Amino acid sequence: MKILHISNFGDKHNGRLYWNQCYKISNGFIRNGHNVYNFSERDKSRSDLLNKFNNNKKLQSSILESVKIYHPDVVLLGHADRIHHETLEQIRSINPNIKIAEWNVDNYMLDNTEHKLKTRSKFLDGIFSTTADNKLSECLSGNFITFFPNIVDPTIEKQKIYNNT
């Protein structure tokens, strides 16, 4: 399966965020035999100064161009807050069979998470969240929402602190 993983990969930080969930998720897909293209939407947004003034127009076209070139089976979003809902609709018009899902590791009550999930839900096939709360089901819009645990990747978490307890 080909997966276009759109998230904040933090390229501007020169490896400082190597432990982020987005890398662990991509690593897991690759280890399970999938082809993953990591698209760092915040870095791409910042790379064109005009994006700041034109509502990320260049970012939206770059995402659509990536979908046309890469032909993913799945678009997976993770904290990809700069993607417009219209862009998600256009992705479906390019490939009506594509699956679009979002993962979330933020507390439901913090950082506008509830609003983000509720407004984006109708454009998604599903949502994966590390926080389980009955309020999360209010985000459903004809799709599914499910719990997934915080991810541990043995290639990243090497300290094994749990052995010290």
Regions found by a protein language model. Name each.
Residues 1, 158-165:
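Nucleotide-sugar donor-binding and catalytic loop/hinge architecture
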Residues 145-161:
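Short, flexible helix-coil linker/hinge segments at the edges of structured domains or between repeats
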Residues 5, 9, 15-141, 154-158:
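Extended catalytic core of nucleotide-activated donor transferases of GT-like folds
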